[in-house]
């Protein structure tokens, strides 16, 4: 297909010479753009492509509210820190909002294995079913399930413990070997969490578990680990010289997970059947929740814009303009605003 260029010629009769105007009309535009070769080129017309504003709030996405963790971290929420109990009622969300310096995480000090990977897994979850994987009253008849509390996880001034875990202790002077299994019949991935207690001294080990040589074994089709408690005095954290290390795995549908131990097991109480949703995510933000609805959420605030690009924040959730680092991005819809004049 041949392209044709139409050029307008304006001829004027003059005494000394003829003047011919070639091209287009200049205007009063002050639009400037940067090109590959030049900066601040004035053009006749241009349109803005870059959104640089937000409302500074956390909003619903397409009518669905986020899960706002408040003073709780992802760890505190998923383990069941007693101070995060109010969050358990929310079963679905558009995204998860966590504050940068949340106070309520692992109330009993210790190491949370593969924590960043767990956050990554939860970032794609939009709802879950929280259910008793091992019911408290019937699963552990030979062990005590009520004495495993600690001042470091206190609630309303009383010693307490995580709402999704059970600290099993000796019963009538004995801690029999235990073996407990669960078959995933949920037709969804199930998130299972547990812990291993590492006392600070051998006296505590004997008093709580009635053995000096304890082990914890956890086995499924995709997970196989054996843990040996490390008894050692450590610097006090939240008043504790002992530690609990926290672990998790995803159990596929129809797979089986088996727990065996002769001491030191922090057993699963509740687990989570996960439903993944397109467009979910986790943001870290100090922004407050507001009665607003948006298509795009950033940690700085929500964006409601039809422009194709934004420079508010690289982390986004929802239907968002593409992030660019530019401070100005315009598309030229006219020509250079300098007419060409030729005399003859």
Curated annotation (Swiss-Prot):
Q: Which domain of life is it from?
A: Viruses
Q: Which residues form the signal peptide?
A: 1-17
> Per the UniProt entry, what are the Gene Ontology biological process annotations, in alphabetical order?
clathrin-dependent endocytosis of virus by host cell; fusion of virus membrane with host endosome membrane; fusion of virus membrane with host plasma membrane; virion attachment to host cell
State one molecular function term (GO): host cell surface receptor binding
UniProt xrefs under InterPro entries: Capsid_hemagglutn (IPR008980), Hemagglutn_HA1_a/b_dom_sf (IPR013828), Hemagglutn_influenz_A (IPR000149), Hemagglutn_influenz_A/B (IPR001364)
Location relative to the cell: Virion membrane; Host apical cell membrane
Record's Pfam families? Hemagglutinin (PF00509)
Can you summarize the PTM annotation of this record?
In natural infection, inactive HA is matured into HA1 and HA2 outside the cell by one or more trypsin-like, arginine-specific endoprotease secreted by the bronchial epithelial cells. One identified protease that may be involved in this process is secreted in lungs by club cells.
Q: List the disulfide bonds.
A: 59-292, 72-84, 107-153, 296-320
The alphabetized UniProt keywords are: Clathrin- and caveolin-independent endocytosis of virus by host, Clathrin-mediated endocytosis of virus by host, Disulfide bond, Fusion of virus membrane with host endosomal membrane, Fusion of virus membrane with host membrane, Glycoprotein, Hemagglutinin, Host cell membrane, Host membrane, Host-virus interaction, Lipoprotein, Membrane, Palmitate, Signal, Transmembrane, Viral attachment to host cell, Viral envelope protein, Viral penetration into host cytoplasm, Virion, Virus endocytosis by host, Virus entry into host cell
Transmembrane region(s) = none
Task: Report whether Signal shows up as a keyword of the record.
Answer: yes
Give glycosylation sites per the record: 27-28, 40, 71, 104, 142, 177, 286, 304
Functionally, this protein is described as follows:
Binds to sialic acid-containing receptors on the cell surface, bringing about the attachment of the virus particle to the cell. This attachment induces virion internalization of about two third of the virus particles through clathrin-dependent endocytosis and about one third through a clathrin- and caveolin-independent pathway. Plays a major role in the determination of host range restriction and virulence. Class I viral fusion protein.
What quaternary structure, including any partners, is listed in this protein's UniProt entry? Homotrimer of disulfide-linked HA1-HA2.
User: Beyond the main fields, what else does the record say?
Assistant: Major glycoprotein, comprises over 80% of the envelope proteins present in virus particle. The extent of infection into host organism is determined by HA. Influenza viruses bud from the apical surface of polarized epithelial cells (e.g. bronchial epithelial cells) into lumen of lungs and are therefore usually pneumotropic. The reason is that HA is cleaved by tryptase clara which is restricted to lungs. However, HAs of H5 and H7 pantropic avian viruses subtypes can be cleaved by furin and subtilisin-type enzymes, allowing the virus to grow in other organs than lungs.
The UniProt similarity line reads:
Belongs to the influenza viruses hemagglutinin family.
Protein name, as recorded = Hemagglutinin
Biological source species: Influenza A virus (strain A/Xianfeng/3/1989 H1N2)
Report which gene this protein is encoded by.
HA
């Amino acid at each position: 297909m041949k392209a044709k260029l139409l050029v307008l010629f304006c001829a004027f009769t003059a005494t000394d010479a003829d003047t011919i105007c070639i091209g287009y009309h200049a205007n009063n535009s002050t639009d400037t753009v940067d090109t590959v070769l030049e900066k601040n080129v004035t053009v006749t017309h241009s349109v803005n492509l870059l959104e640089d504003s937000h409302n500074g709030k956390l909003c619903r996405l397409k009518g669905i509210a986020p899960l706002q963790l408040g003073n709780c971290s992802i760890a505190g929420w998923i383990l069941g820190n007693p101070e995060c109990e109010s969050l358990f009622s929310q079963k679905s969300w558009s995204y998860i909002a966590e504050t940068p310096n949340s106070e309520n995480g692992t109330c009993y000090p210790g190491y949370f294995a593969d924590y960043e990977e767990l956050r990554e897994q939860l970032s794609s979850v939009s709802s879950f079913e929280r259910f008793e994987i091992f019911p408290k009253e019937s699963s552990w008849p030979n062990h005590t399930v009520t004495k495993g509390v600690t001042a470091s996880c206190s609630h309303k001034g009383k010693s307490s413990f995580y709402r999704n875990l059970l600290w099993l202790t000796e019963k009538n002077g004995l801690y029999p070997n235990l073996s407990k299994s669960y078959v995933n019949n949920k037709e969804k991935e199930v998130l299972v969490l547990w812990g291993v207690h590492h006392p600070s001294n051998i006296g505590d080990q004997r008093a709580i578990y009635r053995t000096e040589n304890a082990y914890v074994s956890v086995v499924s089709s995709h997970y196989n680990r054996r843990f040996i408690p490390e008894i050692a005095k450590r610097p006090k954290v939240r008043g504790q010289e002992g530690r609990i290390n926290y672990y998790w795995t995803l159990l596929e549908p129809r797979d089986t997970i088996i727990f065996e131990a002769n001491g030191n097991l922090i057993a699963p109480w509740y687990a989570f059947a996960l439903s993944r949703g397109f467009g979910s995510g986790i943001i870290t933000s100090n922004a407050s929740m507001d009665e607003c609805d948006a298509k795009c959420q950033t940690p700085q605030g929500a964006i409601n814009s039809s422009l194709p690009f934004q420079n508010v924040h690289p982390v986004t959730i929802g239907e968002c303009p593409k992030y660019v680092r530019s401070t100005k991005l315009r598309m030229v819809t006219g020509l250079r605003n300098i007419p060409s004049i030729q005399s003859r």
